[in-house]
Amino acid sequence: MQPPKQPMNKLDASAQGVYLITVTPFTDSGDLDLASTDRMVDFCLDSGVAGLTILGIMGEATKLTAQESHLFVKQVLGRVAGRVPVVVGASAPGFAPMRELTQSVMAMGAAGVMVAPPSTLRTDDQIVAYFEMVNETLGPDVPWVLQDHPVSTGVQMSTPVILRILMNSPACVMLKHEDCPGLAKLSAICAAIKQGNVMPISIL
C-alpha cells in the first residue's frame, strides 16, 4: 500500500480535537508488527480521532533504526490514506538525521513533525538556540510541534523560554504540553497569544 504523495493538508494553528499519540507495535522477536499497525490505525480512525501522532516518546522512536522509522511511517500513512493529519516525531540526536527524516516523511504525506528538546540542554539560552537550529533545519515550509515533556526529556522549559521559541518560530503551529502542573504556563501562553505577543498556536 502506497502512501499519498502529498498531505491532505499541512498542520496549522487551527488544529483541534484528539491527536492520538500511538504506540509502535512490535512482534515477539522485536520486529515491527505491520499487521498490528494496520489494526491500530483502523481502530483509531473508527474511534473518530482528529489526527495521529506517531514516533513520539510513547512510540519508542529511539528504539527504531532509521530504516524502521521510515517503514513504520510509510505503513501508517498508507493506511490512513489522507483521512486525518499525521504528525511524525522527528527528534534526533543530530540535525542531519532530523532533516533527513523530516524531508522523507513530508514527501510521503505527513502533516508536520514534532520535536522535543534533547536532554543535553541545560540553560534557557541553550534551549532557545537549539530551536533556532530546528527552524533552520526544518525550513519555513514544514509545520512543527513543540513537545514539552520534561519527565522524559529532563529539560524544563519555562513559560518565558517557550514564548521566546514561539516568537522565533513562525512554523511552530502547535504546543504539545505535557508538563505538570502546567495550568499557569498554559494560561500565560494563552494570554500572550490574546495580547498579540506571539502568533496563535494550537495547544494539545
Residue map of PLM features:
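Active-site beta->alpha loop and helix N-cap motifs at the rims of alpha/beta catalytic domains
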Residues: Q2-Q156
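Catalytic alpha/beta core domains of metabolic enzymes, predominantly
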Residues: T137-V142, H149-L204
